[in-house]
Amino acid sequence: MVVQHNQPGSTDQSVIRNFCIIAHIDHGKSTVADRILQLSGIVPEREMRDRFLDRMDIEQERGITIKSQAVRVPWTFDGTEYTLGMIDTPGHVDFTYEVSRALAACEGAVLLVDATQGIEAQTLSNLYMAIDHDLAIIPVLNKIDLPSAEPDKHAEEIAGLIGCEPSDVLRVSGKTGEGVADLLDQIVMDVPAPHGDPDAPARALIFDSVYDSYRGIVTYIRMEDGELHDREKVHMMGIGMTHDPIEIGVISPDMTRTKALGAGEVGYIITGAKDVSQSKVGDTLTSAVRPAAEPLPGYRDPKPMVYAGLFPIDNAQFPELRDALDKLKLNDAALIYTPETSVALGFGFRCGFLGLLHMEIVNERLSREFGLDLIQTAPNVTYDVTAEDGSQHHVTNPSEFPDGKIKKIVEPMVAADIITPKEFIGAVMDLCQDHRGIMGTMEYISTDRVEMHYRIPLAEIVFDFFDQLKSRTKGYASLDYHEDGEQSADLVKVDILIQGEKVDAFSAIVHRDKAYSYGVMMTKKLRSLIPRQQFEIPIQAAIGSRIIARENIRALRKDVLAKCYGGDITRKRKLLEKQKAGKKRMKMLGHVEVPQEAFIAALSTGEDSNDRDTKDKIRAAQKTEG
């Protein structure tokens, strides 16, 4: 293993280079990071594995990066040893907040582009973020070893975008390691050194934190000014708390304890605190002995885009769910949650997420890391509803939707940027129109690829828009979106009634044009999931008091005539009349239990409206409306 001569706390700022790797999902960030770790020699050959910095099981299995990782890497250039602070960032649109925090801890960014795919939507969004942070940008084409790579064509695309020469675009292969040494040399030459004041009082920005069940909260920091020493009391300027740190150190590539951290360095500090509220991302850390006067500018708090209810299948697990969310919140600053109660599902939490993948990952982490079995309600967005009497309602859950006449409903909008090959322009336009999109501008970024700009309601994107976009463009299109104001819309609340009683978990707020198809889909789904009873059960979809769709679960027939052998018809009729009266009474008093499996299956986002019968019903209704 390589010996590092630049020791944390005594490294001159002029030899420090902090950079992050940004790219669209699947363009090879983590693979290039692996090669950098290997080349620098800080990871012994026998310990090396693919996606070394993706520490979570989910990251390894799905092949995606969810958490940014900050590593200290030594690199010798022209006889001088430099210290590189490398941050590997996520690529998916849901984790843009992780990327923006990583950018604030760097002076440079390596913009990685797949030489087989070219520029994609997330490449552009990450590039614009890096430009906003005034970072030095190093453009790099990855995967040049693949036979389908077109480096010359894509180098021109990048040059046109950034305003450099095509020859300035570096070419590397994360798989074979070709060109990675040149990339590290370029980082040393192009990325500016940090410019903090080493003699000023210590100031460090908290850019991430994780929870360790043995040592409590591990806080990742970027030192801006001054230095922090081991065992020196630290003060959190935002929340006003003082701690005695247990340990201070750097990640290289595992946690390594050090005596100090100096200006410009990226490292970690363990305060020993177990309370998750005691380490806020974006807060400023300073020395309690010689505190700084002004905190550093923090981050914009992330704003949740999608809300869903999370309920434990076993209600006794509610306290465990609260603890699990508290711990997860520490790793995931973008997650927000408040307790809520549902008549059908009991106690749970209303959670806010950045997007559908974020929601899926949180769900999976809760079940894996904390062993919880959960039911999740259908995702929805926030609406501002004005009732007829002028009262305002902020609705994050269909059950909060006011009854009675509605004057106005305002829904959030997003600006969507879609990059697609030109032969799929028609398919993308159809899809966006079906989802109430408004066409903006369209420009060619190369001879055969187009960037299209649409304004689409967020509610239309959160369900299955991305999957449909991929299937209609054979997987070639990419999507990036950001919030873009709001607009009033003709929305209604569709309630599902089982035996005349509303089941709050199945209610949804949808556009009036799609209310019927949602009603048909949900009633059909429930008909196949709820077990039959001795009496007939109606399942209805309603807007207010108007029923728009209905399915019946047929009654089980008990043969009361089985014990009659031949004989008098009046005897049989008497038995049948008695059964009829019993069923009538049962129907009036009977309570239909919806089994847990039915909730889980009905609320799963996999749409069941693909069968021919449902489609025919919807089509017929649309014709009569037209």
Curated annotation (Swiss-Prot):
Membrane topology: Peripheral membrane protein
A GO MF term: translation elongation factor activity
BP-aspect Gene Ontology terms: positive regulation of translation
Glycoprotein found in the keyword field: no
Biased composition (Basic and acidic residues): 609-626
Physiological role: Required for accurate and efficient protein synthesis under certain stress conditions. May act as a fidelity factor of the translation reaction, by catalyzing a one-codon backward translocation of tRNAs on improperly translocated ribosomes. Back-translocation proceeds from a post-translocation (POST) complex to a pre-translocation (PRE) complex, thus giving elongation factor G a second chance to translocate the tRNAs correctly. Binds to ribosomes in a GTP-dependent manner.
Protein name: Elongation factor 4
Organism encoding this protein: Bifidobacterium longum (strain NCC 2705)
Organism lineage: Bacteria, Bacillati, Actinomycetota, Actinomycetes, Bifidobacteriales
Gene of this entry: lepA
